[in-house]
Amino acid sequence: MTLRVRAPATTANIGPGFDCAAAALDLWNEVEVVEGDGDADESHLGVRAFALLAPTAGKSFRFTDRIPRERGLGSSAAVIALGLVAGALAADKDPAPEKLLAEGVQLEGHADNLAAALAGGVCLTWENRIVRVADNLPAVPIALVPEATVSTAAARNSLPDSVPHADAAFTAGRAALLGAALAQGSADLFGEAIHDRLHEPYRAAKAPLLEAARSNLPEGALGATLSGSGPTVIVWVREESAAASEAELASRFTEASVVRFAVSPEGASPV
């Protein structure tokens, strides 16, 4: 038996959608699982995910990592998704995203990135459940990916135990608007929605590109958000100006890798 599975990068939160909104991106990690005399590394996150659904004994695992680690692009969620889908296929179990999500959150801890990595497209999550709201986003994501890394744990430790009621109310309103923007595919509403006071103000110190991007947006850009817990920043632009915006950002932010992504309608799947 040989299994090959791929899983996409993801961008989570999308402004006010803290821990509940994410989209799959067209950058892929892969795994090849071969039946034989393999000696699996049981400490590997993907192997641990596989083991939730199928035995690892006698199998070898070869992971190909293209998603940069600890940059806010869902690298750990992609690895978990690889293991879950491969494990489900190996055990002849249902690989439905919501069923796999229930298994995977015990490794990931939160569902947003993992939901999008499993289901593809644009997803909202709650209580380990998924609603896939669209194949695409109303705006094009251009990532500013720095060399610096930030662990999810460190980013979460920067969050306060409580926030002012006004900030919570503001973010709840924008999160509701984000849902409407996604459902309608409206770039104008999307640009109004991607503002947050719940997590980004507290994480900004570890992601200096966020304020820099907001102060140097290309003409017509809709805004900028942290990707996941950062430090990668997503600049959101309209489709018609995406190429020009990418070139402008690349000239301004030479200290970062500037990558224009497409949303992947496909999640983790065999290849």
Across the structure, where does each feature detected by a protein language model lie?
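Short beta-strand-to-loop capping motifs
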Residues: E35, P146, V235-E239
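Glycine-rich, charge-dense phosphate/pyrophosphate-binding loop(s)
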Residues: L182-V271
